[in-house]
From Swiss-Prot:
Main location class: mitochondrion
UniProt key word Membrane: yes
Keywords per UniProt: Heme biosynthesis, Membrane, Mitochondrion, Transmembrane, Transmembrane helix
One Pfam family of this chain: Tmemb_14
Gene3D superfamilies in alphabetical order: Transmembrane protein 14-like
Ranges annotated as spanning the membrane: 7-27, 32-52, 62-82, 88-108
Protein name: Transmembrane protein 14C
Membrane-topology descriptor: Multi-pass membrane protein
Source domain of life: Eukaryota
Gene: TMEM14C
Function statement: Required for normal heme biosynthesis.
UniProt family annotation: Belongs to the TMEM14 family.
Location in or out of the cell: Mitochondrion membrane
Gene Ontology cellular component list: mitochondrial inner membrane; mitochondrial membrane; mitochondrion
Length: 112
């Protein structure tokens, strides 16, 4: 794997983000009995984990991770906008937006 110049490789942030998303779905199920929250959390957490794994193998392979975090940023951003509640929509929207920004910056900073 080539050095990208960052202190922590991008995929480690991706694995943490995937764990956050999946655990959010599990917590939503445990606290409120929400099966859709569990299903969405596990689906998007798994996709984010797959994207992070792909990043660990090839730092240029960002598309699954970018699509997953971008989709979650949009969905949870709209939920946060309409509800005004930081938990869980605002937290996931913010984390997703940060991941989109981090991937975007890494795409523009890498050698072509």
């Amino acid at each position: 794997m080539q050095d990208t110049g960052s202190v922590v490789p991008l995929h480690w942030f991706g694995f943490g983000y995937a764990a956050l998303v999946a655990s959010g779905g599990i917590i939503g199920y445990v606290k409120a009995g929400s099966v859709p929250s569990l299903a969405a959390g596990l689906l998007f957490g798994s996709l984010a984990g797959l994207g992070a794994y792909q990043l660990s193998q090839d730092p240029r392979n960002v598309w699954v991770f970018l699509a997953t975090s971008g989709t979650l940023a949009g969905i949870m951003g709209m939920r946060f906008y309409h509800s005004g509640k930081f938990m869980p929509a605002g937290l996931i929207a913010g984390a997703s937006l940060l991941m989109v920004a981090k991937v975007g910056v890494s795409m523009f900073n890498r050698p072509h």
